[in-house]
Amino acid sequence: KSSAAWIQRQANDSYVERAKKEGYRARAAYKIIEMNEKYHFFKNGQVVVDLGAAPGSWSQYVAREFPKTKIFAMDLLEIKPINGVVFYQGDFTSDEALRWLEEKLNLTDSTNGTVDVVMSDMAPNTVGHKKTDHLRQMVLLEYAFDFALCALKKGGTFIAKSFTGGATNDLVKQIKEHFEDV
């Protein structure tokens, strides 16, 4: 029943149709496009990290519009190659994945951040229980936020998508302590 409803929504979704026409892998591209049109956080020559990248539409947009940008993407799921994107398939929360990022980004304990933008569209496998799904996503967001604090240059940008729920306000409060605009 739910998969039939999803198929129906996809068939009637103008963003799904637009993504197909414009060559984006998913409708999610328009979320990052809309945010960038409002806040202008991407520029050519930046270093961008895309966590939870599959199927790749956020990285695809950045690579397409800002071709001189270095993009490092990571996801548990494989993505088809995107010109200008270095991809790692693995669990962002694992030591191995973090070592890969540290190496690619030249991050050490003694360096300041080297990244201009960290974006996270990570989502857990959902179980259908809203509170549980929300809490699982908040754990992933906290990992992404902690990484952003270490990896971002001064004045860098952290972009994250979240399910709404009870734990959101606490994380937003923490983020506001470190970023000017939230």
Role assignments for model-derived ranges:
Residues 49, 82-83, 88, 118, ...:
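C-terminal substrate-binding/active-site "lid" region of AdoMet-derived donor-dependent transferases
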Residues 1-46:
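Class I SAM-dependent methyltransferase Rossmann-like catalytic core
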Residues 44-54:
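Conserved class I S-adenosyl-L-methionine
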Residues 76-126:
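S-adenosyl-L-methionine
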Residues 42, 65-66, 105, 109, ...:
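A generic alpha-to-beta junction signature in SAM-dependent methyltransferases
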Residues 46, 69, 156:
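Glycine-centered, small-residue-biased loops immediately flanking beta-strands
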Residues 55-67:
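Conserved SAM-binding loop of SAM-dependent methyltransferases across substrates and taxa
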Residues 72-74:
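The conserved SAM/SAH-binding core of class I Rossmann-like methyltransferase domains
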